[in-house]
C-alpha cells in the first residue's frame, strides 16, 4: 500500500473543508434552504467528497473535513464561533461539535493506522517520495527540489488553477461563477496533491 495514502487523505479532507468554507462564506446556502434540509445536504456533500475505504479512514476524513470547514469559515469571517443553531453548541467560544468531530477523526485515523500498518509523515511526504527504494531515485523524486527549481510544470499549472479559483471566489458576486470556481478549486487541489504524491514533475 502507498505509504502516502493517509497523508493524501488528510490533505484532501482539509482541502475540501477549505473549499467549502469559501463557498459558504460567499454563498450562504443556509439562508435559502430550511435548516434540517441544509444539514442533510451538507452531510451528503461531505460524505461524497470524502468517500474512501476502509471505513475508519472514511470516518476520519469525513469528520476532519467538517471540522476544518467550520474552522476556516470562522477564520475567513473573522468571527468568534457562536451558536447559530441547536445542533452547534458553543461554550465560551469553543464549538463543542467541532471538538467532537476532531476527537472522532483522531480515533478513526488511529484505528486505521493500528490495523493497516499505515504511517504518515507530512514533512517526509513533501520532500521525498519514499515509494522509491534507491537513494538516487529518491533524490530524483524529491518534489520540493523539483518544485523550487522549475522542474514541476504540471504542478505549476494545477497551483495556478487553485490560485485563480480562490481569487474568483473571493471577488465574484455570481452564484454560478462561485460554484464553478469552487469546483475548479477542488479539482485543482486534488490534481496538485495527486501529482506531487506520484512524483510527477515533467
Swiss-Prot record:
UniProt keywords, alphabetically: Host membrane, Membrane, Transmembrane, Transmembrane helix
Main location: host cell
Superkingdom of this protein's organism: Viruses
Transmembrane segments: 13-33, 40-60, 87-107, 156-176, 177-197
Signal peptide residue numbers: none
Topology of the protein relative to the lipid bilayer: Multi-pass membrane protein
UniProt GO cellular component terms: host cell membrane; membrane
Subcellular location(s) per record: Host membrane
Protein's name in the database: Putative transmembrane protein ORF202
Amino acid at each position: 500500500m502507498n505509504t502516502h495514502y493517509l497523508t493524501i487523505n488528510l490533505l484532501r479532507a482539509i482541502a475540501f473543508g477549505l473549499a467549502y468554507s469559501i463557498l459558504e462564506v460567499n454563498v450562504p446556502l443556509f439562508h435559502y434552504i430550511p435548516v434540517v434540509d441544509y444539514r442533510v445536504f451538507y452531510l451528503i456533500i461531505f460524505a461524497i467528497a470524502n468517500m474512501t475505504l476502509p471505513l475508519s479512514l472514511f470516518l476520519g476524513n469525513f469528520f476532519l473535513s467538517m471540522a476544518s470547514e467550520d474552522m476556516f469559515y470562522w477564520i475567513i469571517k473573522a468571527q468568534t464561533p457562536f451558536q447559530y443553531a441547536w445542533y452547534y453548541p458553543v461554550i465560551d467560544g469553543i464549538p463543542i461539535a467541532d471538538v467532537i468531530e476532531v476527537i472522532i477523526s483522531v480515533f478513526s485515523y488511529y484505528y486505521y493506522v493500528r490495523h493497516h500498518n499505515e504511517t504518515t509523515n507530512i514533512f517526509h511526504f513533501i520532500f521525498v517520495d519514499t515509494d522509491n527504494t534507491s537513494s538516487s531515485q529518491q533524490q530524483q523524486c524529491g518534489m520540493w527540489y523539483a518544485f523550487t527549481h522549475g522542474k514541476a510544470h504540471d504542478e505549476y499549472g494545477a497551483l495556478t488553477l487553485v490560485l485563480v479559483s480562490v481569487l474568483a471566489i473571493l471577488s465574484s458576486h455570481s452564484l454560478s461563477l462561485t460554484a464553478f470556481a469552487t469546483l475548479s478549486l477542488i479539482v485543482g487541489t486534488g490534481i496538485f496533491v495527486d501529482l506531487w504524491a506520484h512524483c510527477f514533475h515533467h
